[in-house]
Amino acid sequence: MGRAFQNRKESMAKTADAKTKVYSKYGREIYVCAKSGGVDPAGNLALRGLIDRAKKDQVPSHVIDKALDKASGVGGEDYELARYEGFGPGSCMVIVECLTDNPNRTFGDVRACFNKAKSKLGTPGSVSHMFDHCAILAFAGSDEEAVLEALMEADVDVTDIENEAGRITVFAPHTEYAKTKQALADAFGELDFEVDEIQFLAQTMTPVAGDDVAMFDKLLVTLNDLDDVQNIYHNAELQG
C-alpha cells in the first residue's frame, strides 16, 4: 500500500503541475491578447476565442479575471512573442512559440533543451516555410456548401473546408482568423466551436524511429517544462 500511495501522490503532483502550467499559459496569453486588442471580448474576437478555449480546458474564472485585470491596468509585465525554429531528432522540424519578458533568458533555455536532445536550433525561417500558419475553426454541422458560401460572401480567403463525421472544419490563413469567425457568427449565429485556434500545420511529415523517438520525447518534455513556452509544433511521425 505504501508504494501505491506514493505512486498516487506522485500522480497527483504531476496532475497539479500540469494544471498549473495550463493556467499559467492561458493567463499569459489572455493578458497579452487583452493588452494589445482590448479587454472587452465583444470587441476583441481573438480574446473571446481564447477565453472560450480556456473555459473548455477548465481554467478557473479567477485566473481569467486576474489576467484581464492586469491587462486593463497601467504598466504590468511586458511580454513579447518569441518564436524559435530548429531540427529535432531524425531531422524532424520543430517550432517553439514563447511569451517572454526576457528574450535572452528564454533563448538560452530553449537552446539548452535542443542541445540536451541532440537537436539543433536554427535561424528564423529555417523550418517555418514548411508549415502553414492557419486559423482553424471546427463545429458541428454537415452543410459544407452553406459554410463555404457564407465565407465567400464575407470575402474570407478560405484555404480548405473539411466535412467529416458531422463536423465542419474551416482552415484559413492566420491573418483571417477574426474575419472568418465573424463571418460564421453572422451567418449561423453563436456556434459552439470544438476547435478555435491558430496553429502551424506541417506540410509534410518526417518519420522518427529507433533511439530518436526517446530523444524526441525528451525534447518535448524539457521544452514543456519551461514556463515561457506556449506552443510546440512539429512534423515528427513517430515510428514503432
Curated annotation (Swiss-Prot):
Pfam families: TACO1_YebC_N (PF20772), Transcrip_reg (PF01709). InterPro entries: Integrase-like_N, TACO1_YebC-like_2nd/3rd_dom, TACO1_YebC_N, Transcrip_reg_TACO1-like, Transcrip_reg_TACO1-like_dom3, YebC-like. GO terms for molecular function: DNA binding. Its main location: cytoplasm. It comes from the Bacteria. Coiled coil: none annotated. GO terms for cellular component: cytosol. PANTHER family: TRANSLATIONAL ACTIVATOR OF CYTOCHROME C OXIDASE 1 (PTHR12532:SF0). This is Probable transcriptional regulatory protein Csal_0810.
